[in-house]
Amino acid sequence: MAAVARTLLRLLGRVPIALLLLVVAAAGCRDADAQAVSYRVIVNAQNPVAQLKRDDVSRLFLKKVVNWKTGAEVQPVDQAQDSPVRRSFTKDIHKKDVEQIKGYWQQLIFTGQGAPPIEKGSDDEVVAFVAKTPAAIGYVSSTAALGSAVRTVQILP
C-alpha cells in the first residue's frame, strides 16, 4: 500500500500545479454556470395570480395542489430534464436536484398516484403552451421573449 502511495505522489509531482488548478477551476466554473441561470415563472395573461410563495409554486409543480383558486385545473409545464433553467428552477423552488424530483415522479407513477407535468424543449415552447392554456404555469429563462399572452408571477419567499 505504501508503495502505491509513493508511486502516486511521484506521478502527481510531475503534473504541473498550474494545469491541476486549471482543471479544478474549469470544473468549478461549469458548476457555477449551471447554478447561475436565472428564470421567471409565467402564467397565462388571463390568470389573475400576480404573486405566489415559493412553497406554493413547488406544490403546483409537484401537483400537490391541483386547482387554482378559481377552480381551474392547474397545468404545470416543465422544461427538458437536462436544461440549465430546469436545474436552477428545481434547486431554487423545490430545494432538490432534478434527479430527486425525477425519483418523486417515478414513485407516483409506479403506484398509480400521479403523472409529472408535461415537458417542453425550449423557452419558446413553454411560452407558446402557457399562452394557449389559461390554467398553465411554467418557467423560462429570464431572457426569454414573452409576448402579451403571458406574464411573469412574482415569487415570494
Predicted features along the sequence, with ranges:
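Exported/periplasmic ABC-transporter solute-binding proteins
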Residues: 32-157
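Intrinsically disordered low-complexity regions specifically enriched for long asparagine
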Residues: 1-4, 26-28
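Residue-level detector of alpha-helix boundary/anchor positions
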Residues: 5, 21, 142-145
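C-terminal segment of classical bacterial N-terminal signal peptides
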Residues: 18-31
